[in-house]
UniProtKB/Swiss-Prot annotation:
It is found in: Nucleus, Nucleoplasm. Pfam families: Cohesin_load. InterPro entries: MAU2 (IPR019440), TPR-like_helical_dom_sf (IPR011990). Plays an important role in the loading of the cohesin complex on to DNA. Plays a role in sister chromatid cohesion and normal progression through prometaphase. Belongs to the SCC4/mau-2 family. Interacts with nipbl to form the cohesin loading complex. TPR repeats lie at residues 99-132, 371-404, 450-483, 490-523. This is MAU2 chromatid cohesion factor homolog. Its main location: nucleus. Disruption phenotype: Early embryos exhibit numerous developmental defects including shortening of the A-P axis, ventralization, and defects in neural, somite, head, eye, and tail development. One of its GO terms (cellular component) is nucleus. It comes from the Eukaryota. Keywords: Cell cycle, Cell division, Chromosome partition, Mitosis, Nucleus, Repeat, TPR repeat.
Length: 604
């Protein structure tokens, strides 16, 4: 049975009544629009003829499949699939019906939140499918995915390891690579980096040595390179990742030129593919956006986000795959951060609202992205100077996340809130101790460690401990220059410039502020441009350069006006009320604001 098509295999096609009923059922199923009720009637009529066990089992499977895919009657679908699974186990040489029924039934159990019923069913199917390579591999993948959704990554990794060894034994290096790459992905999620490195090395060798269908080979390479790129990005190594990212972009270009011929490998265990070509294309756009965001190439991030979102809109018209919504949410999360940096808060807020709406449609999506949503709202609150709300959002996000990198990112931003408030020393010292870049830093991310040095420098600056601040900021500069972290470089330079200005070293201050301004313009980072232009104005005034001082003052005025206008627009949006949401599902309706209710002092 292909998907939900109602067909009769050769062995069961001898009865003319059976063929006639199947023909009618398939006609009704494929009508435009489909006439599912009539299709179901035709299939149910098969039982009136007291059919053989084979026909009975297959008809139960077909009914279960049609009801599962085309109706909301999951109870009746479950009854038919359970009968198909029960009867087919008593019939020899009936693997396609037996394992299709097991696979579909466990999927239905999961949809009904009966995971405890799905697991033993899949385990039994795996146990009795060892002589059927395609189904054995497919069922192993399915059970591994179920464990992954339950966050039981250890069990999922074990199953993928079993699958890889089985694929090797049955001579399928292609599917062995798929199992190993999937395991590598989970090990990366678990941060088991000691196990990831040898596994990725082995995968690289298998992928390069495998000679088979060009699209399958290139899709393996895309999977392999995506893991490598995300591994580097997780580690905050924006410069080191460039060769891998370039290879990945070339690889997706190669795939897009290959013809999508039907892949019919001689080994049934090879009948898998990782992702459709179009999904891979969006994924490559996505990792490119992630790289551009971290590196501070925000216009490039915007360009690739637009391309990816356009592609996603087209795909979602034809494909309801949940992975597309995940891609869309991750893209929006990154572009929202870009907007906040480039001074487009109102647009960022509307996109946060869009993420809320996407999460409303899927409890799993919301569960996976709730912490990120509150983090984004916290960043938005900082940008509009609502520090109490920012603290509440970050505290909520910390409660919801188990992801170490995200936890560290949130704590770093929460520390910046406490520094700005100036009266939260006890909480601040506690936070800074937990993200001490000199001692037991919680994650291996180069970028986050550099940011932790910056936060220390900022705190020392506010306390008037300028030499200590300079030490921390020089450490940030050294780390950010090593990996092309442009935003951190710009922030560190302007803060160092400010310190030298306060100390009366105008020449050294100028040496810091001018490159900070140039870099901030290139990113573009509006808050650093605002800060730099104010410093340049004061520096030039102190040095008696009145023309340059006037020019810098004009720049500062322009940036202030732009930010002020955007600030007023954002705070006037009904979505601004999202800043008070800290519990449960995101609100759908927003009350319009009468006008901005937040202080503008931080902008001027």
């Amino acid at each position: 049975m292909a998907a939900t098509a109602v067909v009769a295999p050769q062995a069961e096609a001898s009865e003319s009544w059976y063929l006639a009923l199947l023909g009618f059922a398939e006609h009704f199923r494929t009508s435009s629009p489909p006439k599912i009720r009539l299709c179901v009637h035709c299939l149910q009529a098969v039982f009136q003829f007291k059919p053989s066990q084979r026909i009975e089992a297959r008809t139960h499977l077909q009914l279960g499949s049609v009801l599962y895919h085309h109706t909301k009657n999951s109870e009746l679908a479950r009854q038919h699939l359970e009968k198909a699974w029960l009867i087919s186990q008593q019939i020899p040489q009936f693997e396609d019906v037996k394992f299709e029924a097991a696979s579909l039934l466990s999927e239905l159990y999961c949809q009904e939140n009966s995971v405890d019923a799905a697991k033993p069913l899949l385990r039994k199917a795996i146990q009795i499918s060892q002589q059927t390579p395609y189904w054995h591999c497919r069922l192993l993948f399915q059970l591994a995915q179920l464990h992954t959704l339950e966050k039981d990554l250890v069990s999922a990794c074990d199953l993928l390891g079993v699958g890889a060894e089985y694929a090797r034994v049955v001579g399928s290096e292609y599917t062995r690579a798929l199992f190993l790459l999937s395991k590598g992905m989970l090990l990366l999620m678990e941060r088991k980096l000691q196990e990831v490195h040898p596994l990725l090395t082995l995968c690289g060798q298998i992928v390069e040595n495998w000679q088979g269908n060009p699209i399958q080979k290139e899709s393996l390479r895309v999977f392999f390179l995506v893991l490598q790129v995300t591994h580097y990005l997780d580690a905050g190594q924006v410069k080191s990742v460039k060769p891998c990212l370039k290879q990945l972009q070339q690889c997706i270009q190669t795939i897009s030129t290959l013809h999508d011929d039907e892949i019919l490998p001689s080994n049934p265990a090879d009948l898998f593919h990782w992702l459709p070509k179009e999904h891979m294309c969006v994924l490559v756009y996505l990792v490119t956006v992630m790289h551009s965001m971290q590196a501070g190439y925000l216009e490039k991030a915007q360009k690739y986000t637009d391309k990816a979102l356009m592609q996603l809109e087209k795909l979602k018209m034809l494909d309801s795959s949940p992975i597309l919504s995940s891609f869309q949410v991750i893209l929006l999360e990154h572009i929202i951060m870009c907007r906040l940096v480039t001074g487009h808060k109102a647009t960022a807020l509307q996109e946060i609202s869009q993420v809320c709406q996407l999460c409303q449609q899927s409890p799993r999506l919301f569960s996976n992205h709730a912490a990120q949503l509150h983090t984004l709202l916290g960043l938005y609150c900082i940008s509009v100077n609502c520090m109490d709300n920012a603290e509440a959002q970050f505290t909520t996000a910390l409660r919801l996340t188990t992801h170490q990198e995200l936890w560290t990112f949130i704590v770093t931003n929460l520390a910046s809130v406490y520094i700005r408030e100036g009266n939260r020393h006890q909480e601040l010292y506690s936070l800074l101790e937990r993200i001490n870049p000199d001692h037991n830093f919680p994650v291996s991310s180069h970028c986050l460690r550099a940011a932790a040095f910056y936060i220390r420098g900022l705190f020392s600056f506010f306390q008037g401990r300028y030499n200590e601040a300079k030490r921390f900021l020089r450490e940030t500069l050294k780390m950010s220059n090593a990996e092309d972290l442009n935003r951190l470089t710009a922030c560190s330079l302007v803060l160092l410039g400010h310190i030298f200005y306060v100390l009366g070293n105008h020449r050294e201050s100028n040496n810091m502020v001018v490159p900070a301004m140039q870099l901030a313009s290139k990113i573009p980072d509006m808050s650093v441009q605002l800060w730099s232009s104010a410093l340049l104005r004061d520096l030039n005034k102190a040095c008696g350069n009145n023309i340059d001082a006037h020019e810098a003052a004009q720049m500062h005025q322009n940036f202030s006006q732009q930010l002020l206008q955007d600030h007023i627009e954002a705070c006037s949006l009904p979505e601004h009320n999202l800043i008070t949401w800290t519990d449960g599902s995101p609100p759908v309706q927003f009350q319009a604001q009468n006008g901005p209710t937040t202080s503008l002092a931080s902008l001027l």
